[in-house]
Amino acid sequence: MPVKNYSEKAYKDKLESIFKRFPSVQKVPFGDAYKPGLEHMESFARLLGDPHLRYRTIHIAGTNGKGSVANMLASVLSAVGLKVGLYTSPHIIDFRERARILLPPASIYPDRARSAVENPATGQAPTSIYPDRARSAARRDLSPSPEELPSESVCCSLVPQEYVYDFLCRYEKDMDDLDLSFFEITTGLAFKWFADENVDVAVIETGLGGRLDSTNIITPDLSIITSIALDHCALLGNTLEAIASEKAGIFKKGVPALVGEYLAETRPVFEAKASQTGSSLTFAQDVELSMEERFESILREMDLRGEYQAKNLRTVLSAVDILKRTPLYSGLSDQPTVEDAIIHTASRAGFHGRWEALRKDPLVIADLGHNPAALKENFSQLERMMSTGEYSSLIIVYAVMADKDLDGILPLMPTDATYVLTGLESTRALPPEDLARRFKEYREGAGKPCKMVVTSSAAEAVKTALSLDDGRNPLIFIGGSTYLLSEASSFFVSRGF
């Protein structure tokens, strides 16, 4: 049935209105946008008819890696015949990236899915917000090109604009009355869409923390924590133990729990919480996987090319081993299907922003890692790539939010690189002149070269980085902030890269 008064302009205007009126981390500090506690979300869910009770769920928290694990797991579950909802945040270009549905392959499960080229909500071709990008499967640091992908590789649909518009119009007064945050609104939207589309299971990623996160009204079949590192300390605590405790708040009574990576400080926290909830607890880094002999092969072939994905892959395969013990997930025993689905996660799930090649010549790689733990992995991989002698120079486009641990990041940044430091549209971003000052102070104090260019916008920064191409095969990296990745990706998409 057509949505009353819907048009693309009406959709964009309504979304912008909601975004401006309700607090979100994109435009205000986390402390102002984050509403700890579940009361508002529980009330909103009741008003929506408790949609999250109409399907099974898997809950994922963690400082780093939860988006990758969520997308890999959703890809696998859909490949074995389940209709899978996937809720992640933030989005990179299109708001609707936050809520996706992955369909089973139609040729294998004709009674479970429509054609992989059809949107289950609209009957139209699935939405793609990114044009085809030149990629090479021969390189470990690049993703495969579209022509190298299986014909049914694209099986993901974004929540339709019409649905978003109707939802925001229908429940706008309730959103005001309940004094919701933007994240609570998007969580309710995703939960209801999944119910309306009759998904079998939804993979739900927390927004921030776990215990008091809006998504924590669900009782999942499996609770997963990917990793713990220092981030959002003002809200979650200043120690690894405190942050682990907040994340472990997603453990539920009698629900199995899986931890991807633990540290000496965090393992006792997880063990204590699992004991309280009566949850069987598995540490992925300690177990022998049923697909252990295929691990390295899968890692080499994955279209998620960051070397840090090794940890996430082990977490996903551990989750598969736990879930396949129950009837709903028995299809996960099909190892070839599981392997293929993981290998093609980025293409099947429409997943972007993780060691993604935005351009081939010169090679431009982008990653949304933004805290010291994530950036250490990024910078280490860049240095290994440079050590091969294949690239003439390293150019890094960098921006940072004002609340991030810049003092912890500066020592990790590659020494021999040219830096293009920039500002962002977000009011949370550290102004470029402040970033440049602190960068220079650290470099001079450490006796390191201080090759930098300062720009005011992401678009200007990308143009500057490309202008530094010496024609001898430079390597360009864009990172430090999700918002930088969003603005840079928009730049490349608008120019057809």
Describe the role of every protein-language-model region.
Residues 173-208:
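Phosphate-binding/switch loop-helix module in NTP-utilizing enzymes
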Residues 107-116, 127-137:
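Long, intrinsically disordered low-complexity tandem-repeat segments
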Residues 196, 201-206, 213-224, 228-232, ...:
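Nucleotide phosphate-binding/pyrophosphate-handling subdomain across enzymes
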Residues 1-62, 69-82, 87:
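Short functional linear segments
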Residues 73, 211-221, 489-491:
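Short Gly/Thr/Asp-enriched flexible loops that form oxyanion-binding sites at enzyme active sites
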Residues 110, 115, 120, 144-146, ...:
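Acidic, Mg2+-coordinating active-site environments of NTP-dependent enzymes
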Residues 71-109, 152-170:
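N-terminal phosphate/diphosphate-binding loop that engages ATP/GTP or pyrophosphate donors
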